[in-house]
């Protein structure tokens, strides 16, 4: 929630940390309920989560998206988001909100607990694009075995949905292996 701190405070934090550890890696979640500062972080040493990448990939794997935007994201979002390659933290799922498989599930209720073959193919396409894109790929715990929160978006106090179901690792071993090959 770096936006709450603001760019000037983030610059101060960066300067202080780099005095102690010059090669420190700094990553920001560039938004809050008030706004978004990813573009402003472009001229700092901070990398940030690329939510534009996340949103585009969700649409692209469903057949919506154009080649120019795909090229932009494959190149690491260079014109607005990132000045240098590692500044773009490319992701399609994080700890918050619904999981990737719930978001792209064919089921109308958005529950990806029982993914279709198409859902799995879309996930493999996303993984290939994520790992070949310029920038830093970020995957969420369990994303490689199609973790589902049963379509629930806000699981802040839902340990039953936030816990990893490792039985899915066996059930979706080929998807896990596909991610592992890219890594």
Regions found by a protein language model. Give the residues of each.
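Conserved alpha/beta catalytic core and glycan-binding cleft of carbohydrate-active enzymes
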Residues: 10, 14-141, 145-146, 150
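Short histidine-centered catalytic/ligand-binding loop motif
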Residues: 114-115, 165-171
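Active-site groove signature of glycoside hydrolases
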Residues: 1-4
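Catalytic cores of secreted or luminal carbohydrate-active enzymes
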Residues: 171-183
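Acyl/amide activation-and-transfer machinery of modular secondary-metabolite enzymes
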Residues: 156-166
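Reverse-transcriptase-like RNA-dependent polymerase core
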Residues: 152-154
């Amino acid at each position: 929630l770096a936006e709450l701190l603001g760019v000037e405070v983030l610059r101060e934090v960066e300067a202080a940390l780099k005095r102690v550890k010059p090669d420190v890696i700094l990553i920001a979640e560039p938004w809050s309920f008030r706004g978004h500062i990813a573009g402003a972080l472009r001229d700092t040493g901070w990398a940030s989560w690329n939510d534009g990448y996340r949103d585009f990939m969700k649409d692209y794997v469903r057949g919506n998206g154009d080649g120019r935007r795909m090229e932009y994201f494959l190149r690491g979002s260079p014109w607005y988001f990132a000045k240098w390659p590692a500044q773009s933290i490319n992701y399609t799922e994080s700890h918050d909100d619904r999981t990737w498989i719930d978001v792209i599930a064919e089921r109308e209720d958005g529950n990806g607990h029982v993914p279709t073959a198409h859902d799995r193919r879309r996930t493999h396409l996303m993984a290939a694009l994520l790992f070949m894109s310029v920038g830093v790929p970020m995957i969420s715990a369990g994303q490689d075995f199609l973790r589902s929160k049963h379509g629930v978006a806000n699981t802040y106090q839902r340990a039953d949905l936030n816990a990893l179901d490792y039985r899915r690792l066996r059930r979706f071993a080929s998807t896990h292996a596909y991610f592992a090959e890219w890594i």
